Amino acid sequence: MGEDTQKTQDFTEAHPGNTSLHGEYTVNGASGLGELYVKDNDRITIEFKADEDYFLKDVIYNGKSMLGSMQETYASDGSSQGSVSFNINNTSAVQTLEVQFSPEWAYSTALSGGNIVLSRYVGRNTVVNVPKTWDYYTSASNKVTMPVLLNKSDMGSGIGPFGENREIEIINYPVGGVQCLEHNYGFLYADCVSLRQINNMIYDNAAVSYFGTFARCSSLSEIPSLGGGAALVNIAYMCDGASKITQYPYIGGSQAAPAGVTRIDMAFNNCKSISGTYRINNTQIDIQKAKNSFATHSSGYTNVICSGNTYNSLAFYKSTTSGWENVALNGARSAMLMMDEKENDSIKEKSEPVTVESTEEIIPEDTEQSEDTEETETIEETEVAENTETVEEGTEIEK
């Protein structure tokens, strides 16, 4: 570096040598921190390696957090080894540097519209407390307090901010919630197999996608009310494999949920035990002990498959030009009903058969039906056997 402008930066005893609690690091390639020569406005590069199950949490330079100056603190796969760089412009002869490692938060700190973005949580704690705000220090050491946002998921890899964390049992959001960036809750909790409780919630006031939000959350028994605003555009695979759901929320947080859903695709696929009420667009889907529930909605047709259901388990309300049309699978063990919205006024005249198949061994259970389930008038001429034990494999029930 320029010899005429060299200054000796004496890093204090806050960090003797090149080690820190639960990890080690180098500064500008030097493992011994006795003397470093850096110019004003020069850059410091820290290469770090955390101990097992620990991650980089913060870098404190002259008593200020420098995380806000970092675009990314670690590899996207949640690695605890990597490098970070930031500019310095302090002319003080004595500088202090502290590198912190934590078993909890590992940040991705790109800024977005004056907010701190949390892209990934890779901690090992069973209880996670999501911060409401975070202090960011500018290059001029000015402190700015910014809201924390949750970043959208990487749809290609199927990983959300908390995705694939098998240790998390409880997530505590701050009162008032945390907003999700770009209105995408995709895979937010996917594969959080130990997650059993979510307190408070994220919120949003714009178009929302819930693609795979609770996929394979096998320990979560109740989903809290979800955010939602002007439009719900996609709830595909939302609860795929979430096997113990006992209560669904109102999408949008109220009975008068917003309109505009463009896709419901396999929302309840492979859900082994479901009960309760699910509402979307002010329309109710009653689910009673459903298994492998599959629901699709598009502008062309509605396809409802309830595979392996022993009970009167699913009622799907389909949008038509004349209003909502109730499609019920009354006691069908495995059935498929396909209806074209263009033909919603002449469904009775459709010639395709409804196929009812047995896909697994029948285990006698209490077959008491839900009080909320009603036989539909729109397919009154389609008779689906209510006693699943009498339905033979491959039997077709003609209209």
Residues of each region from the PLM?
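Surface-exposed interfaces of beta-sheet-rich extracellular modules
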Residues: 43-80, 165
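Exposed beta-strand face motif in extracellular beta-rich ectodomains
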Residues: 42-44, 93-97
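Solvent-exposed loop and capping/linker segments of extracellular ligand-binding repeat ectodomains
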Residues: 3-11, 24, 37-38, 67-73, ...
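Mature, Sec-exported extracytoplasmic domains of Gram-positive
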Residues: 37, 41-44, 52-54, 338-399
